[in-house]
From Swiss-Prot:
Keywords from the UniProt entry: Cytoplasm, Methylation, Protein biosynthesis
Highest classification ranks of the organism: Bacteria, Bacillati, Bacillota, Clostridia, Peptostreptococcales
Name of this chain's protein: Peptide chain release factor 1
Broad class of the protein's primary localization: cytoplasm
GO CC annotations on file: cytoplasm
InterPro entries: PCRF (IPR005139), Pep_chain_release_fac_I (IPR000352), Pep_chain_release_fac_I_sf (IPR045853), Prokaryotic/Mito_RF (IPR050057), RF-1 (IPR004373)
Length: 357
């Protein structure tokens, strides 16, 4: 680990010199690339420098503690300081191990979220709407923007399907473990006998595909159909062919968008979703190549995997992958999901650390 940290510090200093070079500054593409690389390794280098400074302080304090000329009171103070410094060093070593873990290249990206009502009829659609509100409230609390892509309502205040984008640095790193089947247990308002019903909704989290180079789509492989929107956007929505359906012929992926009144905007949104689905498909294929014994319990992103249960009578939320339960259901559904997300990230990091050891 120390060799790798020393190498990164040397690289950081070398990059610092390069980004100050007038010739490189004139090449904005190269300069931006170096700036990005420099900023990515800066936190690790700063932590490594702090670690080395603490190591040096520990050595000096130990010398004072073992010096025969040091009086008893000062030795006692030095002993206490040694204990504190040793604790700090152990903590920093763990932090550095985590910082050196391989990073997901998609972590900083915006995300496209797809939520669909599953088993349970109208209740499933209502639960899909609850999850939509939960994620949009979480986005607001994080200072991120939400952009609606497509909405298909169920007619009872629920959603058959809702697709939206969350724009914010690091959105994918925080939300990528939300993909899977979410289960709800509650008493429907229409249930006179007070029986608890179980229904599900599926969530898919995809990183937004970059416009340049990341996902190449041949326009000859697309079939684009336009049709009249069936949404609740007023009469003007239904009098023009503003809705768009794009079919990617090689994969059979189909994306529809009818949320806006502009056919052009609907087409742009549908293309964004299609690109992100294709990128997500590539990620899923890469994950499938990982041998079963090394596959992360948290990060499989299996779309059919039941990952979480929301139990209304007991006021609890349980994540089945990490066996964590929180008893703050109302707050959780209002977007206060950081505690669960942090636990999932910590668990995923622990699994990665076991793999690299």
């Amino acid at each position: 680990m120390l060799d790798k940290l020393a190498f990164l510090q040397e690289k950081y200093e070398d990059l610092g010199e390069k980004i100050s070079d007038p010739e490189i500054i004139n090449d904005q593409v190269q300069w931006q690339k170096l700036i990005k690389e420099h900023s990515e390794i800066e936190p690790i280098v700063m932590k490594y420098r702090e670690y080395k400074t603490t190591q040096q302080a520990l050595g000096e304090t130990k010398e004072i503690m073992h010096d025969k000329a040091t009086d008893a009171e000062l030795k006692e103070m030095a002993k206490m300081e040694v204990e504190e410094l040793e604790e700090s060093i152990v903590e920093m070593e763990e932090q550095l191990k985590v910082m050196l873990l391989p990073t997901d290249p998609n972590d900083d990206k915006n995300v496209i979220v797809e939520i669909r009502g599953g088993a349970g009829g109208d209740e499933a659609g209502l639960f899909a709407a609850v999850l939509f509100r939960m994620y949009t409230r979480y986005a607001e609390r994080s200072g991120w923007k939400v952009e609606m892509m497509s909405l298909n309502e169920s007619g009872v205040g629920g959603y058959k399907e809702v697709i939206f984008m969350i724009k914010g640095k690091g959105a994918y790193s925080q939300l990528k473990y939300e993909s899977g089947a979410h289960r709800v247990q509650r008493i429907p308002t229409t249930e006179s006998g007070g029986r608890i019903h179980t229904s599900t909704a599926t969530v898919v989290i995809m990183p937004e595909a970059e416009d340049v180079g990341e996902v190449n789509i041949d326009t000859n492989e697309l079939r684009i159909d336009v049709f009249r929107s069936s949404g609740n956007g007023g009469q003007s929505v239904n009098t023009t062919d503003s809705a768009v359906r794009i079919t990617h012929l090689p994969t059979g992926l189909v994306v529809s968008c009818q949320d806006g009144k502009s056919q052009l905007k609907n087409k742009e949104k549908a293309m964004k979703v299609l690109k992100s689905r294709l990128l997500d498909q590539m990620i899923q294929e890469q994950d499938a190549e990982i041998s079963q014994d090394r596959r992360s319990k948290v990060g499989t992103g299996d779309r059919s995997e039941r990952i979480r249960t929301y139990n209304f009578p007991q006021g609890r939320v349980t994540d089945h992958r990490i066996n964590v339960t929180v008893y703050k259901l109302d707050a959780f559904l209002d977007g206060e999901i950081n505690e669960m997300i942090d636990s999932l990230i910590t668990s995923a990091q622990a699994e990665k650390m076991q793999e690299v050891q």
